[in-house]
Amino acid sequence: MRVVVQGPGSLGSLVGGVLAGGETAVTLLGHQSEHLTRVREDGLRVVQPDGTTRVTRPSVATDPSVVADADLVVVCVKSYDTASAARALGRQCDGAMVLTLQNGLGNAAVLAEHVPADTVLVGTTTHGAARTEPGVVRHAGGGETTIGRYRGANDARVASVAAAFSTGGMETTVTASPQRAVWEKVLVNVGINAATALADVDNGALVECPPGERVLERAVTEGVRVAEAEGVSVSESVVERARQVAARTASNESSMRQDLAGGARTEVESLHGAVVERARDHDIAVPVIRTLADLVRLAQRDG
């Protein structure tokens, strides 16, 4: 299987390293950067949770035309870049499956505007990752990964993608309800990301002290009501799942914390903002989520 990972940030680099470690032919596609230069010259170093390091050697590309020969494109760009990434895929893809492993709501729908909807796969993962220096990504904690078709029934092609991830060490299951999985991942992110970014703490702080526990629980509980109003029946244990993810990735910096600390744009609009927008459609009050969203916007001076 020939795989292109579009967006070699923290998660994209981890995914590329996992797939390349399973002997899949992998290309990291991104803008020219010191990170890609280092990967091209020295390989991609994946630091495992136990401290050991695995070096893999994915190819590197900056020209989007590389996706023309791919069997699978894994989209890991930030959610605010989905539209531009989708347009590039629409011009270059030739029958490849397109898997979104992004944060937030609505990414698959945007991709399906530019590539055939029956080629779009919706994925979620709770694996933690952090790019610590050029050419190096730290696998900050294990998790669950699921994939499923955006439109239509799952088939052998979907199973082959799951097998490639599992072979590389990221155990992946196929689900018939990918949108439910997306919502549950969004709710976990809503419970963890903004709070850790604003308080400048690792994920584990949210389950180690009462204030963190309260914010996580209230935010996720608000989000559950919105998901149900949208017709998505999420697991009753999603609050506990958020706690488990925070505990399992206790030493990890959430992506929003990394972005805010580095002066980069966050994905608050596709996470907290998207939930607030849908809550407004159903006249549901989400004061904690709304406040978290506004505080992140204030911190990044955006809107």
From Swiss-Prot:
NADP(+) binds at residues 7-12, 78, 103, 129, 267. The active site is at 185 (proton donor). It catalyses: (R)-pantoate + NAD(+) = 2-dehydropantoate + NADH + H(+); (R)-pantoate + NADP(+) = 2-dehydropantoate + NADPH + H(+). The keyword Oxidoreductase applies. The keyword Oxidoreductase applies. Pathway: Cofactor biosynthesis; coenzyme A biosynthesis. Belongs to the ketopantoate reductase family. Catalyzes the NAD(P)H-dependent reduction of ketopantoate into pantoic acid. This is 2-dehydropantoate 2-reductase.
